[in-house]
């Protein structure tokens, strides 16, 4: 019992996790959540006002309830489908979208992850939100698209297919966990590039460097599968991985191997920590060394998309 009392944060994590799971599986209405938070806050204030041992259980119960409801509220808030301007709430097939990453070349198409910025409903331009996957018919115009570009599209979104086999990797669930619920295929005359690019310049630079590094890997005669694994390990670029490779690694429990992780960051930190040994001899060298290490680690995080 004493050990339990010495772990207050752990005790609060349990109702928080239960709240997240409750919202995921049952989707509690927002109004009920707010009512619950208000009741819990009143209970908490009452127990603080009484401030006697007799009412301590109310303080504990209300604290757990607040964390439980807070988890439900946060999970509800970050669900893109609960956004009042989500594209799925509008009846339209004309959209303005923004590329969230660089395009990815597939065997028969060009893939892009985009964010819906505007819907066009009855001639009116309405601000919108939500992410989708677009597949473009291959041509030179598509290959010029980069992160941050805005394009106009004319299409009807399609739901992502469920796996056909019971043991197959659930690509639909994987995308939904990342806030993506629809996809679309665009032939050449169903989209048009605008002159607008609202990408963040730091990310633009990081993606350009990653493109250059990927070109170096391509010039080393790797097979397509080897290139996809190498780009995931070294550059954090997992878009080149096909479903078969993802399924192979996930079924063997080794999917984490293909992700840039804290281990990579730790190795880079140690390498530069010892490379910058000469800074230790300077008067303010330790401060300069620390600043450089932070810049390098943050730069690597941007470079790999962490």
Positions of PLM-derived features:
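N-terminal leader/targeting segments
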Residues: 1-85, 90-92
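Hydrophobic alpha-helical transmembrane segments in multi-pass membrane proteins
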Residues: 2, 11, 19, 52-55, ...
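Membrane-interface helix/helix-cap signal primarily in integral membrane proteins
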Residues: 2, 55-59, 64-256
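A generic alpha-helix surface/boundary motif
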Residues: 16, 211-213, 294
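Hydrophobic positions within alpha-helical membrane elements
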Residues: 24, 204, 266-269
């Amino acid at each position: 019992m004493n050990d339990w009392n010495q772990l207050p944060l752990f005790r609060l994590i349990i109702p928080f996790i239960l709240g997240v799971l409750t919202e995921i599986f049952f989707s509690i209405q927002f109004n009920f959540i707010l009512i619950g938070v208000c009741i819990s806050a009143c209970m908490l204030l009452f127990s603080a006002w009484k401030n006697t041992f007799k009412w301590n259980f109310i303080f504990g119960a209300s604290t757990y309830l607040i964390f439980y409801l807070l988890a439900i509220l946060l999970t509800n808030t970050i669900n893109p489908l609960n956004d009042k301007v989500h594209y799925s709430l509008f009846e339209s097939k004309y959209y303005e979208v923004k590329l969230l990453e660089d395009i990815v070349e597939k065997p028969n198409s060009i893939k892009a992850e985009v964010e819906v910025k505007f819907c066009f409903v009855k001639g009116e331009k309405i601000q919108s939100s939500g992410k989708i996957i677009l597949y473009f018919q291959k041509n030179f115009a598509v290959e010029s698209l980069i992160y941050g570009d805005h394009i106009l599209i004319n299409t009807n979104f399609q739901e992502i297919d469920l796996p056909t086999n019971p043991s197959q990797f659930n690509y639909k669930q994987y995308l939904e966990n990342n806030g993506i619920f629809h996809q679309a295929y665009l032939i050449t005359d169903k989209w048009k590039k605008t002159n607008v690019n609202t990408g963040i310049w730091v990310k633009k630079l990081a993606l350009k460097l990653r493109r250059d590094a990927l070109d170096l890997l391509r010039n080393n005669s790797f097979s397509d599968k080897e290139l996809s694994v190498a780009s995931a390990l070294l550059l954090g670029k997992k878009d080149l991985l096909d479903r078969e490779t993802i399924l192979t690694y996930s079924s063997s429990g080794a999917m984490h191997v293909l992700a840039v992780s804290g281990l990579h960051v730790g190795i880079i930190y140690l390498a530069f920590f010892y490379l910058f040994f000469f800074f230790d001899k300077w008067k303010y060298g330790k401060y300069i060394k620390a600043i450089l290490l932070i810049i390098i680690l943050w730069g690597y995080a941007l470079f790999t998309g962490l």
